[in-house]
Regions:
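Short, basic, glycine/proline-bearing loop/turn elements
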Residues: 55-60, 86-94
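Charged phosphate-binding loop/patch that engages nucleotide di/tri-phosphates or the phosphate backbone
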Residues: 2-15, 152-175
């Protein structure tokens, strides 16, 4: 007889990882709101397209999130240059290159060819946040000899925090 009980330890790890990932997203949003107020950049979260398939009794909506090629964040920097960023978070000590969704590599490659800045914002459960150039992420195997990264691999891309704790993704925001 198969044991269908879920491992409570693994469940707790999953809950904690999800909460940390949501905090990472809130930190990113707060930084971009700050840059918008300063007139440094206008970078917005790309809405996830939701496809409604129907309603259950009681009005509950049934549907699914459609796969998308657009990155999580898109916007413009002061001076007119476009910027695109895909945000990824892991509760593990490494992040796989395959975490970028199908279709996104081609999308980001095209934007980069046209002169946009493109990055992957990588968050790790130990609190580290990194802004990795898309060209480095895309050629991870050539840079690191494997298709995943660890925090030790990407220290040069670490995003500092300001004295108030804000992620200084584009710099301190005092420019």
């Amino acid at each position: 007889m198969e044991n269908n009980r879920k491992d409570p330890r693994r469940q707790l790890i999953g809950v904690v990882s999800k909460a940390l990932g949501q905090q990472f997203e809130r930190d990113i949003n707060a930084a971009f709101d700050h840059y918008r107020r300063l007139g440094v950049a206008s970078i917005e979260k790309t809405p996830e397209p939701f496809h409604m398939t129907g309603r259950e009794n009681g009005g509950k909506v049934v549907g699914f999130y459609e796969k998308k090629a657009q990155p999580d964040y898109a916007g413009t920097l002061r001076g007119g240059r476009s910027v695109y960023m895909e945000a990824k978070f892991t509760g593990s000590n490494r992040m796989e290159q395959s975490r970028v969704s199908p279709g996104q590599p081609e999308y980001l490659d095209e934007k980069m060819r046209l002169g946009a800045f493109c990055y992957v914002l990588a968050g790790f459960s130990h609190g580290g946040a990194y802004c990795i150039p898309w060209s480095v992420w895309r050629s991870m195997k050539e840079h690191y000899g494997r298709k995943y990264i660890t925090e030790n691999d990407i220290t040069q891309y670490k995003i500092p925090r300001t004295t108030t704790g804000m992620l200084a993704i584009l710099g301190t925001g005092k420019e």
